[in-house]
């Protein structure tokens, strides 16, 4: 089974999915946010399409570790999603994942227009890959 990772923003949701061995994350799509109901509907369809067994959602924390306003919105989204799907949903600290994604794209000399199109997807990859790497490290210790 696969694991799906999300980078939830105010305007978009970046989506990444693991390989079947749950070792690597691949960016899949960016959902343009419409309404909570439609967003949940699109996410649910992706979960079914990719036969996902677990969801990982990036939770933005402030640099001091506290949760900010966007984190509250994400927790509300997770609560709504839990009503629709019967798989575990975990959060991971997503501090700086969007900045890491932007830096990666800048180093690759990707144009500003293209960066804007893929940054949320790449942030979702970073979120999911962080989770997958932790699982590998946990199993090796």
From Swiss-Prot:
Task of the protein: Could be a nuclease involved in processing of the 5'-end of pre-16S rRNA.
Matching NCBIfam families: RNAse_H_YqgF
Pfam families: RuvX
Source organism of this protein record: Natranaerobius thermophilus (strain ATCC BAA-1301 / DSM 18059 / JW/NM-WN-LF)
GO molecular function, one term: nuclease activity
Signal peptide positions on this chain: none
EC code: 3.1.-.-
GO cellular component terms, semicolon-separated: cytosol
Annotated SUPFAM superfamilies: Ribonuclease H-like
Protein name: Putative pre-16S rRNA nuclease
Subcellular locations according to the entry: Cytoplasm
CDD domains tied to this protein: YqgF
InterPro entries named in the record: RNaseH-like_sf, YqgF, YqgF/RNaseH-like_dom, YqgF/RNaseH-like_dom_sf
